[in-house]
Amino acid sequence: MSIRPILIHPDPRLKKLCDPVESLSTEIGQLAEDMLETMYDAPGIGLAAPQVGVTRRLIVMDCVKEAEAPPRPMVLVNPVITWSSEARSVYEEGCLSIPEQYADVERPAEVRVRWTALDGTTQEEEFKGLWATCVQHEIDHLDGKLFIDYLTGLKRQMITRRMEKLKRERARA
């Protein structure tokens, strides 16, 4: 396993529509392991393949927050939202590709998602609360959408300028 560099917005690779994973190869398994390690190291609760420069429909997440609870790492290949509730919830979202920037985003409070597991089985689960927000946020990445795309133009521009400045500072370092 290895930690991969996380792309920082603005980067055109973060805005691309990702291709489906065609086969569950050793490379896909390695990508999933690397993504989990990268996510935990960041630290974060979710990571999508395009955030590490791979335009494939693969996400990882683990939204367990309780200190004494065991981790629940999840790998979702080709995830699809099959149902979303009419009820909405608002969470303050952040993103590993938009470091230290947070904003309230409204999304469906509950969603049902179907995906392929690394062992090739089809899985389906209903997510609520933070898990629902996270899975929707990560699936958005697969469609080239960032959480700041839900914000007003002015807020989005301000955050983008901050990220451009951060990238310039990191390039100088």
Regions found by a protein language model. Give the residues of each.
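Positively charged
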Residues: 1-173
